[in-house]
């Protein structure tokens, strides 16, 4: 059960008002926190609970729901051989969250990818620019309201091979 997990117990003690949900599925614990508290929670997990490896940051688009977006952090404690998932909901009107690059350098490119694909604004990111799409690309291709056929664009005229 998630309630018996050491990390969940510690987070409930320190961030009772910031935690929105705690679940466990197939041994994987997920905590959902208010976006305003994301850096404090991630720092506690890193410094106090030894979740020393940020494996991924991504986003999910729940078009038609409020909140529309969920930013998802996958953390691993190498010393404790444990994983935890941390989620933070974002509304469509305020699609921004603090960058985790101050805690983990590995957040750099994955936050840029979430920005590029979903339009999530990672505040205080050192270089929040597109990483996969061209600089002139309009829109964010993994949003559920992005046109399936893609935007009308001129065919590529450069060398293909």
From Swiss-Prot:
Tell me the Pfam families matching this sequence: Complex1_30kDa
Alphabetically list the UniProt keywords: Cell inner membrane, Cell membrane, Membrane, NAD, Quinone, Translocase, Transport, Ubiquinone
Which Gene Ontology CC terms are recorded?
A: plasma membrane
Asked if the record carries the keyword Methyltransferase, the reply is no
Q: Which GO terms describe its molecular function?
A: NADH dehydrogenase (ubiquinone) activity; NADH:ubiquinone reductase (non-electrogenic) activity; quinone binding
Q: How does it sit in the membrane?
A: Peripheral membrane protein
Q: Where in the cell is it found?
A: Cell inner membrane
This enzyme catalyses: a quinone + NADH + 5 H(+)(in) = a quinol + NAD(+) + 4 H(+)(out)
Q: What class of enzyme is it?
A: translocase
Q: What are the EC numbers? A: 7.1.1.-
Q: Which InterPro entries does the record cross-reference, listed alphabetically?
A: NADH_DH_suC, NADH_quin_OxRdtase_su_C/D-like, NADH_UbQ_OxRdtase_30kDa_su
Annotated signal sequence range: none
Keyword Coiled coil on entry: no
Please state which protein family the record places this protein in.
Belongs to the complex I 30 kDa subunit family.
| Physiological role | NDH-1 shuttles electrons from NADH, via FMN and iron-sulfur (Fe-S) centers, to quinones in the respiratory chain. The immediate electron acceptor for the enzyme in this species is believed to be ubiquinone. Couples the redox reaction to proton translocation (for every two electrons transferred, four hydrogen ions are translocated across the cytoplasmic membrane), and thus conserves the redox energy in a proton gradient.
Read off the HAMAP family from this record: NDH1_NuoC (MF_01357)
Q: How does it assemble?
A: NDH-1 is composed of 14 different subunits. Subunits NuoB, C, D, E, F, and G constitute the peripheral sector of the complex.
Its protein name is NADH-quinone oxidoreductase subunit C
